[in-house]
């Protein structure tokens, strides 16, 4: 039996409102699936899922605003949830679709929940990984969880997070992938270098 040929991953850009988003896409099925990455990641986080899902669907994995090759608006106000949701709506328009299945992880899952709550008509299916429904997260919040979520507040500070992350050749980024992975060794040295390269992409 011959192995199935690997599907091609194609790169492109979509102008959505005031920003330009880089994305990769795979497959050509009728149903659109949008994959939203977490923090501090980019489309590469979905590299294993893209060719598998692409056998049945048209799969799109954007670099969300502020990440890798997408535009990086300078103000904190440029990253409010309304604008992040609008970016996903812009992707739907770019691909000429009125609905999509959304698969999202971490920070991207927060955006996906907001999209589904505010625009349920555009979400055919939703798979949110690692982030519960916002109301459930709020109602079950504990001090221990709040302490573990320190980074969400830290990375909203001006300038300090950039200095912290870039010190010693982005050693902190290295640690984030090596020490927080559920499965030790899940990220190869090559993977981590690719993630570091994405972090240093200019604005």
Which positions does each model-derived feature cover?
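Active-site machinery of serine-nucleophile hydrolases
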Residues: 54-63
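Structural cue for short, hydrophobic secondary-structure segments
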Residues: 35-38, 61
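Alpha-helical segments within the soluble intracellular
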Residues: 53-54, 93
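Flexible "cap/lid" subdomain of the alpha/beta-hydrolase fold that forms the substrate-access gate
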Residues: 1-12, 18-21, 26, 32, ...
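The serine-hydrolase catalytic nucleophile loop
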Residues: 39-50
């Amino acid at each position: 039996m011959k192995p199935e040929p690997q599907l091609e991953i194609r790169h492109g850009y979509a102008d959505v409102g005031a920003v330009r988003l880089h994305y990769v896409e795979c497959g050509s099925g009728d149903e659109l699936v949008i994959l939203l990455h977490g923090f501090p990641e980019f489309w590469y986080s979905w590299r294993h899922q893209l060719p598998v899902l692409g056998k049945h669907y048209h799969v799109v994995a954007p670099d969300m605003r502020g990440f890798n090759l997408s535009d990086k608006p300078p103000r904190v106000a440029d990253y409010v949830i309304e604008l992040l949701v609008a970016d996903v709506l812009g992707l739907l328009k770019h691909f000429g679709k009125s609905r999509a299945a959304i698969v999202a992880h971490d920070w991207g899952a927060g955006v996906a929940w907001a999209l589904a709550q505010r625009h349920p008509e555009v979400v055919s299916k939703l798979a949110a990984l690692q982030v519960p429904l916002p109301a459930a997260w709020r109602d079950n919040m504990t001090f221990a969880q709040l302490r573990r979520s320190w980074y969400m507040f830290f990375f909203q500070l001006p300038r300090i997070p950039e200095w912290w992350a870039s010190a010693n050749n982005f050693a902190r980024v290295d640690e984030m992938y090596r020490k927080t992975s559920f499965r030790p060794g899940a990220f190869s040295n090559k993977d981590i270098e690719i993630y570091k390269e994405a972090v240093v992409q200019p604005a």
